[in-house]
């Protein structure tokens, strides 16, 4: 029995190592390519002896990444904030009050999650044009918030059902606390793990969004990183050093965010999966 368990653990460890290598290799190639000086065509597997950071500064200027970074941070930050606030507020009564109406609303949210966003793109674009909101941060924030709200409510609901004791809420209610006070002073602080999970997931999705950005943010002044990077890649397809440097800079904020919140991210996923 013990030998079989040890063998299983070795197989799992080996598979985990293979998956880790599969994810690390593209990043390593990207890093070595970005650090090579112009004209250095040595193998992508060899780390450069003479490291050059000139590619980063040149890519930053030529791709106008500064403006794109600001636009993307505004859209991602406000969208994630709205998702956390309104998603948690919507999930709490759905998780705690299992009425027929709440069950129907929850089922509707789940069904929305399986609908591809592109199916509604044409009518949505016409509505945005009629409202005169094309090329504005507000429409990008609104659309991204609406797109990822069902997933946010789903994750919050599962976490609340599995980890927030009903007795804790009942005790606060007996003491005379109102619904909103109970939520913001007792429930919401306990949602830190799943909030970190939602923050990472939503930020990564919105940061990397291309389909909404290419439709609604066509003006260069409001372009996000994905749109700016797509244009930059097309113009510099033969200059892999610049392309690699630009790609590294674009992905860096999300890597930092994940490293900062990874402890809560894992806790949020595991806790929310314990109970339906």
UniProtKB/Swiss-Prot annotation:
Induction: Repressed by the transcriptional regulator MelR. Induced by melibiose and raffinose. Disruption phenotype: Deletion of the gene abolishes induction in the presence of melibiose and raffinose. The keyword Membrane applies. Keywords: Cell membrane, Membrane, Polysaccharide transport, Sugar transport, Transmembrane, Transmembrane helix, Transport. Residues 69-261 form the ABC transmembrane type-1 domain. The chain crosses the membrane at residues 11-31, 74-94, 104-124, 139-159, 186-206, 240-260. GO terms for biological process: polysaccharide transport; transmembrane transport. It is a multi-pass membrane protein. One of its GO terms (cellular component) is plasma membrane. It is found in: Cell membrane. The keyword Cell membrane applies. CDD domains: TM_PBP2. Pfam families: BPD_transp_1. Its main location: membrane. Belongs to the binding-protein-dependent transport system permease family. The complex is composed of two ATP-binding proteins (MsmX), two transmembrane proteins (MelC and MelD) and a solute-binding protein (MelE). Part of the ABC transporter complex MelEDC-MsmX involved in melibiose, raffinose and stachyose import. Probably responsible for the translocation of the substrate across the membrane. This is Melibiose/raffinose/stachyose import permease protein MelC.
């Amino acid at each position: 029995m013990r030998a079989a368990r040890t063998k299983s653990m070795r197989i799992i460890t080996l598979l985990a190592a293979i998956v880790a290598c599969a994810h690390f290799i593209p990043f390593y190639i990207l890093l070595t390519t970005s650090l090579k000086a112009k004209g250095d065509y040595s193998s992508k597997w060899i780390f450069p002896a003479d490291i050059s950071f000139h590619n980063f500064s040149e890519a930053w200027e030529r791709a106008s990444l500064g403006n794109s970074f600001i636009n993307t941070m505004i859209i991602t930050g406000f969208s994630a904030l709205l998702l956390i606030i309104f998603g948690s507020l919507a999930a709490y009564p759905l998780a705690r009050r299992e009425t027929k109406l709440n069950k129907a609303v929850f089922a509707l949210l789940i069904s929305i999650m399986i609908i591809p966003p592109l199916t509604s793109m044409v009518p949505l674009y016409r509505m945005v044009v009629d409202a005169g909101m094309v090329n504005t941060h507000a429409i990008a924030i609104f659309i991204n918030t609406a797109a990822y709200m069902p997933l946010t409510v789903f994750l919050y609901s599962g976490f609340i059902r599995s980890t927030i004791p009903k007795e804790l809420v009942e005790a606060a209610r007996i003491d005379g606390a109102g619904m909103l006070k109970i939520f913001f002073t007792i429930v919401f602080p306990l949602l830190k793990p799943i909030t970190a999970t939602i923050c990472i997931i939503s930020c990564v999705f919105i940061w990397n969004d291309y389909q909404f950005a290419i439709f609604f943010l066509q003006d260069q002044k409001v372009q996000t990183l994905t749109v700016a990077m797509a244009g930059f890649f097309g113009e510099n397809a033969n200059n892999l050093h610049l392309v690699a440097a630009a790609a590294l800079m674009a992905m860096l904020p999300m890597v930092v965010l994940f490293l900062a919140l990874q402890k809560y991210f894992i806790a949020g996923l595991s806790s929310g999966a314990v109970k339906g």
